Swiss-Prot record:
GO MF annotations, alphabetized: toxin activity
Main location: secreted
Underlying gene: THI2
Listed GO CC annotations: extracellular region
Entry-linked SUPFAM superfamilies: Crambin-like (SSF57429)
Name of the protein this chain belongs to: Thionin
Matching InterPro entries: Thionin, Thionin-like_sf
Function, in words: Thionins are small plant proteins which are toxic to animal cells. They seem to exert their toxic effect at the level of the cell membrane. Their precise function is not known.
Pfam family, one: Thionin
Residues annotated as transmembrane: none
Alphabetized UniProt keyword annotations: Disulfide bond, Plant defense, Secreted, Signal, Toxin
Family: Belongs to the plant thionin (TC 1.C.44) family.
Residues of the signal peptide: 1-24
Length: 133
């Protein structure tokens, strides 16, 4: 039971962290700066610290300022949602798959629920609104 609680806690924490990445856009002056930002974020550092380290800027709109044309998150319709779902499922739900494969644990239902949660989280429930409209 404790293992399920830990997994659920990690999933919720990851989804909250992913929300910040979806709502903000990172603009960088060069590709190398974007790569530095990405590597920094992989260490678990905050968006602000990584932006300061790499020379990138965090913007709330959809357009990067002049000179910062190398953006991380391109906002082209459903591309953002698909990127979110793919990233969420691979990073959060991948741990469940690894657990299943390495420890012979039956967590097929948990993996399915995890991918559904990622989908709902990334679309912010907009699919349900469309279905009921």
């Amino acid at each position: 039971m404790e293992g399920k609680t830990v997994i659920l806690g990690v999933i919720i924490m990851s989804l909250v962290m992913a929300q910040n990445q979806v709502e903000a856009k990172i603009c960088c002056p060069r590709t190398i700066d974007r790569n530095i930002y990405n590597a920094c974020r992989l260490t678990g550092a905050s968006m602000t610290n990584c932006a300061n380290l790499s020379g990138c800027k965090i913007v709330s709109g959809t357009t990067c300022p002049p000179g910062y044309t190398h953006d991380i998150l391109q906002n082209y319709g459903d591309a953002v949602n698909e990127y979110c779902k793919l990233g969420c499922a691979s990073s959060v739900c991948g741990a469940l798959t690894t657990l299943k494969n390495s420890m012979q644990v039956n967590c097929e239902g948990a993996v399915s629920q995890c991918t559904n949660a990622c989908s709902n989280f990334c679309t912010k429930g907009s699919a349900k609104v469309v279905e009921t409209a």
